[in-house]
Amino acid sequence: MNQLAASVSVDVQTAYIETQSSPDEDKYLFSYTITISNLSNEAITLKSRHWCITDADGRKSEVHGTGVVGETPTIKPNSSYEYTSGTVLETPLGVMEGSYTMVDSDGNEFEAPISAFRLSIPGLLH
C-alpha cells in the first residue's frame, strides 16, 4: 500500500431511508455519509471513485465515476472532507466497498481503499 494511502482514513455512517423505499417493489434506499480524513502532511485531491455493491442475493454492481457528489475535493493536511450520497438495493441487506483514486501534490496517483460496510434495514440483524 502506498504510504499516503495509509494516511487516508475513511469513516462511513449509513441510514435506511424508509420514506423513499418501497419494499413491496424490492426498492430499499440507503444513504451513506463518508468522512475522508487526510492524516498526512501534504494536500491530496480525490479524482475518482470505484464502488462494488453486493445485495443479499449476491447481485453485484460496480460504479465508477469522477469525484464524489459532483466535486473533486482537495483535502488539506490533517483535514477532512465529508459528503452524503445514496444507493438503492433490491434487498433489505447489502454490502458496499471500493476505493478512491487520489492524487498527491506531486501529481502521483494512489488508491485509498474503502473497507466493506453493511447496508441494512433496522432490526434485520442482531
From Swiss-Prot:
Question: What residue stretches are annotated with the ApaG domain?
Answer: 2-126
Q: Which residues pair up as cystines? A: none
Highest taxon of source: Bacteria
Q: Name one Pfam family in it.
A: DUF525
Q: Which InterPro entries match?
A: ApaG-like, ApaG_domain, ApaG_sf, Uncharacterised_ApaG
User: SUPFAM superfamilies attached here?
Assistant: ApaG-like
Name-wise, this protein is: Protein ApaG
Q: Which gene encodes it?
A: apaG
